Regions:
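Tandem amphipathic alpha-helical repeat scaffolds
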Residues: 2-8, 33-47, 86-103, 131-145, ...
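TPR-repeat structural position
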Residues: 10-11, 48-50, 104, 149, ...
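Amphipathic alpha-helical segments of tetratricopeptide repeats
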Residues: 14-24, 57-69, 75-77, 112-124, ...
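Structural signature of alpha-solenoid helical repeat junctions
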Residues: 30, 79-86, 106, 124-131, ...
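Hydrophobic alpha-helical segments and helix pairs
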Residues: 36-37, 41-81
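Aromatic-anchored, glycine/proline-accented short structural segments
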Residues: 91-163
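C-terminal non-catalytic interaction modules
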Residues: 188-238
Length: 238
């Protein structure tokens, strides 16, 4: 199931879910996992709205942290909460939905909250590092959308550099495309012709590298997405 989720093969994920439902225990942790994954799959398949997705994730979070909202935008916001991995994945799902509906301030708060918790050392170092680099890339998206291009690039590059230094291949293509996207936005808004050309060249190079990595991994989703971007922005046929 996790492999199909990482490859965005959500129709196959749905089939796995049907089998898992028959075998899963009645523990809170298992029910929370099932609720999160089912909501994600239904949302990505277009079967529920972003608001319904958020509501289901909120219900999943409340299974283990009833007052979780107070740590995000309530009176406990300044306090670092020791989130478990499953709770972080639920928050990341909320981040996806808030970005999609344009609630970018909430999106940023969620990713910053996750990163602070991961930096606090509550989780084992390897898992925390892998989750952090993904959330750095996630944080770059709303920052870029709000025109905070340099901040977005810094976060995206921090995540990519972490992945490279640790030999973390799983999210490498997405991280590279995040950096390439930030450079594209900087180029588009730059009045410095030399920098504009430099950022475009770096973006093109990174997209091409990401394409070949996706192709080697038989990652058809990202391969198609990158090919479309290269064709649209640079007129390249891959």
């Amino acid at each position: 199931l996790e492999d199909t989720l990482s490859k965005r093969e959500y129709d196959i994920s749905k089939q796995y879910l049907a089998h898992i439902c028959e075998k899963i225990s009645d523990s809170v942790v298992d029910r929370q996992y099932l609720k999160r994954v089912r909501a994600l799959v239904d949302y990505e398949l277009g079967e529920i709205s972003a608001q319904a997705f958020i509501k289901q994730l909120q219900e999943a979070m409340e299974m283990t942290i009833p007052a979780y909202e107070s740590y995000l935008w309530g009176d406990q916001r300044g306090r670092i909460y020791p989130y478990r991995e499953q709770e972080i994945l639920i928050l990341m799902g909320m981040g996806i939905a808030y970005y999609d509906v344009g609630e970018l301030d909430k999106d940023i708060i969620i990713y910053e909250t996750i990163i602070r918790s991961l930096d606090a050392g509550y989780m084992d170092e390897k898992n925390a590092a892998e989750l952090k680099l993904i959330n750095l890339a996630n944080l770059a998206r709303p920052l870029g959308k709000l025109g905070r291009y340099e901040e977005a690039l810094a976060k995206a590059e921090e995540g990519l550099n972490m992945a490279i230094s640790r030999g973390y291949a799983h999210g490498l293509v997405e991280l590279m495309m995040g950096v390439a996207g930030c450079r594209m936005r900087i180029a588009k808004n730059s009045v410095d012709t030399k920098r504009k050309q430099q950022e475009l060249a770096e973006s093109k190079k990174m997209m091409q590298q990401a394409y070949y990595i996706a192709a080697a991994r038989k990652d058809k989703y990202n391969q198609k997405n990158i090919a479309e971007n290269l064709n649209y922005h640079f007129g390249l046929e891959m």
